[in-house]
C-alpha cells in the first residue's frame, strides 16, 4: 500500500503496532506501558506490513514498530518518533511534567539515561536477536543461540548487582520505576529466562523486581494477553 490510510486519526497521538494487538512485539509494549502510566490519550493503529507499506516508511525509515505519530505539526508535517527508546524519551519529555518517569533533576535524568542506554546497547539488542535466532530464524544455529543466551546471563548479572545495592528497589532510581525499568522488563521474565535455559530465581533481586513490575496495573493492561516473548518480535 502506497497511500496513507484515511482512517488514521489526524488529531491525536498514534502508536503504530503490528498484528492484532498492541503487544505484538516486546518493544511495542514499552511505550504502551508509559502511555498507561501517564494516562496519555492515544490511538493504536495496526500496520498490516511495515516493511511493504510505503506510507509507513515516511513515519519510520527503518520500517519497524513501534513508531509514534504526534498530533503536533511544524511546517505542515507531523512529528514522528521511532525506535522504542526514542518513543519512551519522547513520551516522558512531552507528558511527564513532574519527572517521575524520566528523572526530576540532572542527577536523576543521568541515572535514567545511563541505564536506558545500557539496555538499548546490551540486553535489548541481545534479547531481540536471541528471540529471533531461537524462535524465528529458519535455521537453528546452536553456537549463536548459546552465545546470545550467555550474553543475557551477563546482563542479568549486571542488573542483579544493581538491585543488590542498599535501598535500590528499581534499576535507575532507588525509590520508583522509570523508563529504564520499562525498557528492561520485556526481556526479564521467568518465561524468557526459561527459554534461554536460565532460571530467573538465580537472580533473586532481579526476579523480585520483575514480579513487582509485572504486577503494575499499567503493565497488566498493556500486556492484555499471556506474555509470550517468542511471538513478541518481528
Swiss-Prot record:
Entry GO MF terms? glutathione transferase activity
* Superkingdom to which the source organism belongs: Eukaryota
**Entries under InterPro entries matching the protein:** Glutathione-S-Trfase_C-like, Glutathione-S-Trfase_C_sf, Glutathione_S-Trfase, Glutathione_S-Trfase_N, GST_C, Thioredoxin-like_sf
- Biological or metabolic pathway of the protein: Mycotoxin biosynthesis
List the coiled-coil residues.
Answer: none
Q: List the disulfide bonds.
A: none
- What triggers or suppresses the expression of this protein? Expression is co-regulated with the other genes from the sirodesmin cluster and corresponds with sirodesmin production.
Which catalytic reaction applies to this protein? RX + glutathione = an S-substituted glutathione + a halide anion + H(+)
Span of the signal peptide: none
Keywords (alphabetical) are: Transferase, Virulence
Per the record, a Pfam family? GST_N_2
| Domain spans labelled GST C-terminal | 105-230
Q: Please report the stretch or stretches of sequence annotated as the GST N-terminal domain.
A: 15-99
Record has Nucleotide-binding as a keyword: no
Per the record, the similarity remark reads: Belongs to the GST superfamily.
Q: Which PANTHER family match?
A: GLUTATHIONE S-TRANSFERASE-RELATED, GLUTATHIONE TRANSFERASE 1 (EUROFUNG)
Please give the function described in this protein's UniProt entry. Answer: Glutathione S-transferase; part of the gene cluster that mediates the biosynthesis of sirodesmin PL, an epipolythiodioxopiperazine (ETP) characterized by a disulfide bridged cyclic dipeptide and that acts as a phytotoxin which is involved in the blackleg didease of canola. SirD catalyzes the O-prenylation of L-tyrosine (L-Tyr) in the presence of dimethylallyl diphosphate (DMAPP) to yield 4-O-dimethylallyl-L-Tyr, and therefore represents probably the first pathway-specific enzyme in the biosynthesis of sirodesmin PL.
| Name this polypeptide is given | Glutathione S-transferase sirG
| Natural source organism | Leptosphaeria maculans (Blackleg fungus)
Name of the gene this protein is made from: sirG
Amino acid at each position: 500500500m502506497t497511500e496513507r490510510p484515511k482512517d488514521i486519526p489526524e488529531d491525536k497521538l498514534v502508536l503504530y503496532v503490528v498484528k492484532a494487538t498492541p503487544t505484538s512485539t516486546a518493544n511495542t509494549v514499552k511505550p504502551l506501558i508509559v502511555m498507561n502510566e501517564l494516562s496519555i490519550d492515544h490511538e493504536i493503529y495496526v500496520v498490516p506490513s511495515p516493511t511493504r507499506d510505503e506510507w509507513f516508511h515516511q513515519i519510520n525509515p527503518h520500517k519497524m514498530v513501534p513508531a509514534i505519530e504526534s498530533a503536533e505539526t511544524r511546517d505542515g508535517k507531523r512529528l514522528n518518533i521511532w525506535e522504542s527508546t526514542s518513543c519512551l524519551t519522547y513520551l516522558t519529555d512531552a507528558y511527564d511534567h513532574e519527572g517521575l518517569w524520566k528523572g526530576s533533576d540532572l542527577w536523576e535524568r543521568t541515572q535514567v539515561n545511563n541505564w536506558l542506554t545500557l539496555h538499548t546497547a546490551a540486553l535489548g539488542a541481545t534479547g531481540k536477536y536471541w528471540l529471533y535466532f531461537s524462535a524465528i530464524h529458519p535455521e537453528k544455529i546452536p553456537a549463536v543461540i548459546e552465545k546470545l543466551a550467555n550474553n543475557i546471563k551477563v546482563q542479568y548479572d549486571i542488573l542483579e548487582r544493581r538491585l543488590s545495592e542498599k535501598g535500590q528497589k528499581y534499576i535507575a532510581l532507588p525509590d520508583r520505576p522509570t523508563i529504564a525499568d520499562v525498557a528492561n522488563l520485556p526481556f526479564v521474565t521467568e518465561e524468557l529466562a526459561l527459554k534461554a535455559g536460565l532460571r530467573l530465581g538465580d537472580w533473586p533481586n532481579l526476579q523480585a523486581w520483575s514480579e513487582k513490575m509485572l504486577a503494575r496495573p499499567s503493565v497488566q493492561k498493556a500486556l492484555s494477553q499471556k506474555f509470550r516473548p517468542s511471538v513478541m518480535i518481528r
